[in-house]
């Protein structure tokens, strides 16, 4: 039961902390922006957990693409990349790696998977970009436009003080091994 309790406490802590961080801005959901956010979310998954990264990144992605009619593929690729594949680099990102860490596997052992993760990210982001560009062009041709008053690149982070708690959780997990 100790293993499961550790897992639940970590998951709950990252869920609560990352759920109180909000990213917002006036970015429109274009293929380039979506690729950037998927890449960022995938890399974040190993450091704040797949649940934490999913909580943090899904709201801005949904909001930025709300104006689009063709957007199902965005959530599908989000689940593949951020909610699953991205957690492979540290025990914080993936429950089986956490169990291994609790049984003596070094914390940074799985970092050797970084080249494989990057390779898979490039392939999936390339495929995603082509799906998204095709859907984006159809939406624009249908007369749909982003729902922002003044396009720009301003991104706001609310609840940034919670980043300190995320760092504390990560350090606590590393020190517990």
PLM features per residue range, with description:
Residues 1, 12-30, 43-56:
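Transmembrane alpha-helix boundary signature
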């Amino acid at each position: 039961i100790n293993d499961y309790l550790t897992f639940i406490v970590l998951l709950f802590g990252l869920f609560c902390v990352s759920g109180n961080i909000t990213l917002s801005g006036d970015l429109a959901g274009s293929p380039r922006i979506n690729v950037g956010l998927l890449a960022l979310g995938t890399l974040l998954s190993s450091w704040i957990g797949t649940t934490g990264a999913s909580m943090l990144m899904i709201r801005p992605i949904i909001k930025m693409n709300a104006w689009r009619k063709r957007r199902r593929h965005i959530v599908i690729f989000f689940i593949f990349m951020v909610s699953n594949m991205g957690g492979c680099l540290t025990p914080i990102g993936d429950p089986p790696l956490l169990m291994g860490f609790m049984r003596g596997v070094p914390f940074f052992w799985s970092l050797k998977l970084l080249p494989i993760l990057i390779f898979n990210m490039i392939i999936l982001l390339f495929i995603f970009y082509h799906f998204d560009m095709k859907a984006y062009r159809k939406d624009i041709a249908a007369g749909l436009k982003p729902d922002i008053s003044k396009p720009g690149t301003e991104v706001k982070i609310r609840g940034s003080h919670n980043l300190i708690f995320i760092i504390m959780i990560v350090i606590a997990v590393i020190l517990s091994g």
